[in-house]
From Swiss-Prot:
Primary gene name: pheT
Name of the protein in its database record: Phenylalanine--tRNA ligase beta subunit
SUPFAM superfamilies (alphabetical): Anticodon-binding domain of PheRS, Class II aaRS and biotin synthetases, Nucleic acid-binding proteins, PheT/TilS domain, Putative DNA-binding domain
Cofactor: Mg(2+)
Species this protein is from: Chlamydia abortus (strain DSM 27085 / S26/3) (Chlamydophila abortus)
InterPro entries per the UniProt record, alphabetical: aa-tRNA-synth_II/BPL/LPL, B3/B4_tRNA-bd, DNA-bd_dom_put_sf, Fdx_antiC-bd, Fdx_antiC-bd_sf, NA-bd_OB-fold, Phe-tRNA-ligase_IIc_bsu, Phe-tRNA-ligase_IIc_bsu_bact
């Protein structure tokens, strides 16, 4: 949300510096960016009042204007359609430097236009670089009538804009009033409401409509106003909108937009000729039907979608956008003005069905203030009456009522336990009261806290504690640790740090899956009982579905590769009991690395994902002797490119190449390699692993290569580990050199080549010693290979 500093200052009892505002936003968790429009780029442009206009004797479309700057008069030839006496405009004197529409600089000089001398130029907003200040049409920029004469025009127009990046939980800040409320609390200044937003109540008629659905819209108001038109907004209103960098459209639309941006309450305008106000209400669509919207887009509204309608037809998609047929237009003279409080979940459901976005929907989905529905409507009505004095306002129709605010119980002991700071009962009471909560003391160290209607993010006791910490973080001086040390948390943190530093991106996916995503991993699913949405009905029992969906999204948006991991909770069923476990998922797809002149193109393979697991194990000092790799038969993986990983004979996880049909189902064209490990089991093993210092060898090593012909079912790594398990003083390492498999489909054997490294750390081994040790190991291995009918070539 982008607003000007000057508009924000109007809500404070005393002015705040830009530094104070930025620091306050940092404390309450709102990101800010500053954009300053400087007046130094223009010179010799002052404010002047047109005191007389005369027709140009030699040109029908030009006038000769006389302007007064408070000290002297200036004669200027002007062709603007709104050049008339008694308005204050920007006057560029000779020597002033401006820019044309293409950005090219030029200098104002004294000149003659059709034989009449012109001592400068009257300027429009676009010529000053402030085109956002007025509607896009040729004409002079008009200052308010009380603007001082002879002042720098650019200095009066220049302002500082602040871009506020709001997180979804801060919907109550999506307005000038909301932002000012938060900043005022942190900076300890009083919040004031400008005069244009403070009005006395108007006549109300409370109605009862059996068709109105309060589960969508608990509070609905509308009013008929006669005698208006779609004329150009006065400069004052255009300038007010410009403080949000909003373009002017027409008077009525500008008023509703300004009220929404300033107070956070969206309003909607209907043409009264097309809408029956007596039957106007909100309901769920009874059947699927089409609707042409304000943006000329035709949509199909599914059954059950929240709509606004009268007894004749649908007039809008509730909380999102109105219909084009009932919209305010150039011929409208009578309007119906609507203000309502829609439940956020109802509008979110509509946007799920129809992916439309609007400023109104942005606010309704995050939650608006039901207490501001009528005040915002009053403000809009009075603004309309100010611009259209002859307009007639009928009584306001009201359906439903304002829902009560939730009341929570807060224990002082809870605050101290979470924050780690000793706080008295009165301190907690005072802090919450200053935040706008209604606090009532209770017995036994607890408080009854009524949440303000605009705070949709406060629903539980812990939210109140978080709010205290968020708004006054500098008061929280840690006197003691708020929680005990968690080995699992520290271990997870180390895994994240290692994998992220090694080049993998961390993904975060939702624990709850929709049916389509869950089906990527399993066919039979258990659905949760209390479903908040049809898009979140299944608890995941693996990280695979979420990671696979995220991978598809990134690759389909032209990402060259996805090398990512996720550390999260999965939910499994064992002996009819559900349990939560921590799981680590690693997924690779696309290119192996970014192409450059240094690296040749390399493709990912089964061994790429295996390599990542080995790097992780080395980081935690888990020896290869402690884990084994065995063939597996999981349906999600390629039948011949998958394996189970066992650690101390306990299943740790599995890895491999995902099944091509699964990749096709997920709309991924590249092979996908995936691994998933139990973090709980990994932590248990890591506790036993000890890093031991190994001095660098000073004596040379020797090696011997052997080739084993074994049954194709024998894992090559099993041979390597078998050799390492034999008692030997000098066998330092065994590595796999190559594996050869006969292309003949009837062949049952394969050749595995191994390299045995021998070394004595205290002296150089003789060739005879190495040969004797080598022969001894081969003899032992021959005995082990009897069952496999393998042979050995050394």
């Amino acid at each position: 949300m982008r607003v000007s500093l000057s508009s924000l200052q109007r809500f404070f009892s005393s002015p705040l510096s830009i530094k104070q505002i930025i620091e306050a936003c940092d404390h309450i968790g709102i990101e800010t960016e500053i954009e300053t429009l400087l007046s130094s780029s223009f010179s010799s442009i002052i404010t002047a009042k047109i005191i007389q206009t005369l027709p140009h004797p030699n040109a029908d479309k030009l006038v000769v204007a006389t302007l007064f700057d408070g000290k002297q008069e200036h004669q200027v030839v002007c062709g603007a359609p709104n050049c008339r006496p008694d308005i204050i405009v920007p006057l560029a004197l000779p020597g002033a430097k401006l820019h044309d529409h293409e950005g090219n600089p030029y200098t104002i000089k004294k000149s003659k236009l059709r034989g009449i001398e012109s001592q400068g130029m009257c300027c429009g907003a676009d010529e000053l670089g402030f085109s956002h200040l007025q509607k896009t049409e040729r004409g002079l920029f008009e200052f308010p009538a009380n603007t001082p004469l002879g002042e720098s025009a650019c200095a009066l127009l220049a302002d500082t804009w602040i871009e506020f990046s709001l997180t979804p939980n801060l919907g109550h800040c999506a307005s000038l009033l909301g932002l000012a409320r938060e900043i005022a609390h942190v900076t300890h200044v009083d919040l004031i409401l400008p005069q244009e937003f403070s009005f006395s109540p108007l006549e109300i008629i409370t109605k009862d409509s059996p068709s109105h659905d309060t589960s969508i819209c608990p509070f609905f108001c509308c009013v008929k106003i006669s005698g208006v038109c779609a004329e150009t907004s006065p400069q004052e209103l255009q300038q007010a909108l410009s403080q949000f960098k909003q373009k002017s459209i027409n008077t009525i639309v500008d008023i509703t937009n300004y009220i929404m941006l300033a107070m956070g309450q969206p309003l909607h305008v209907y043409d009264a000729k097309t809408v029956d106000i007596d039957s106007l209400h909100a309901e769920k669509a009874q059947e699927q039907h089409g609707l042409k919207l304000l943006n000329n887009e035709e949509v199909l509204i599914p059954q059950g979608t929240a709509i606004i309608c009268d007894k004749n037809h649908t007039v809008g998609l509730a909380g999102v956008m109105g219909s084009g047929d009932s919209s305010f237009n150039e011929t409208t003279t009578d309007i119906i003005l609507e203000a309502a409080y829609f439940l956020p979940k109802a509008i979110r459901a509509s946007q799920m069905r129809i992916p439309l976005h609007s400023e109104a929907a942005y606010r309704f989905t995050r939650g608006t203030d039901p207490d501001h529905v009528l005040p915002s409507l009053y403000a809009a009505i009075h603004y309309i009456q100010k611009l259209f004095p002859k307009a007639k306002v009928a009584p306001i129709h009201v359906l439903g009522s304002i829902p009560p605010s939730p009341t929570l119980t807060l224990r002082t002991e809870m605050v101290e336990r979470v924050l780690g700071v000793p706080l008295s009962h009165s301190q907690v009471h005072e802090e919450l009261a200053s935040l706008g909560f209604t606090v009532t003391p209770q017995d036994q160290g607890s408080l009854s806290v009524q949440v303000p209607a605009y705070r949709h993010d406060i629903r539980e006791e812990i939210d109140l504690v978080e709010e205290m910490c968020r708004t006054q973080p500098w008061k929280i001086e840690k006197k003691k640790a708020p929680a005990t040390y968690s080995p699992l948390y520290a271990f997870k943190r180390e895994i994240v740090d290692f994998l992220a530093q090694s080049g993998l991106q961390q993904f975060f996916t939702c624990d709850l899956l929709d049916m389509e995503t869950a089906a990527l991993h399993r066919q039979e699913t258990d659905y949760i009982a209390l479903q908040g949405s049809k898009h979140a009905t299944v608890l995941r029992d693996s990280l695979l579905p979420g990671l696979l969906k995220s991978t598809a999204t990134n690759l389909n948006r032209q990402a060259p590769y996805v090398h990512a991991f996720e550390l999260g909770t999965i939910y499994t069923k064992k002996n009819a009991q559900y349990q939560e476990t921590q799981s680590l998922g690693i997924i690779l797809s696309g290119e192996a690395e970014e192409l450059s002149w240094v690296f040749h193109e390399r493709v990912l393979s089964f061994y790429s994902i295996k390599g990542w697991l080995e790097r992780l194990f080395r980081h935690f000092y888990i020896s290869s002797k402690t884990y084994t790799i065995r063939p597996s038969e999981h349906p999600s993986f390629h039948p011949y490119q998958q394996a189970d990983l066992y650690l101390h004979k306990h299943l740790l996880g599995r890895f491999g190449t995902l099944h091509p049909q699964l990749c096709k189902k997920a709309h991924i064209k590249h092979p996908v390699f995936f691994a998933e490990l139990s973090v709980d089991s990994l932590l248990h093993t890591q506790k036993k692993a000890i890093a031991r210092y190994q001095p660098y060898p000073i004596y040379p090593s020797s090696f011997r290569d052997i080739t084993l012909t074994v049954d194709e079912s024998v894992p090559a790594d099993a041979l390597r580990k078998k050799l390492l398990s034999f008692p030997s003083k000098w066998l330092e390492n065994v590595s796999i050199i190559s594996i050869y498999q006969n292309k003949n489909p009837t062949a049952q054997n394969k050749n595995v080549s191994l390299r045995l490294v021998f070394q004595n750390k205290e002296r150089t081994l003789s060739n005879q010693e190495i040969e004797e040790e080598h022969e001894r190991l081969l003899a032992m291995l021959n005995e082990q290979l009897d069952d496999t009918k393998g042979t050995i070539d050394s």
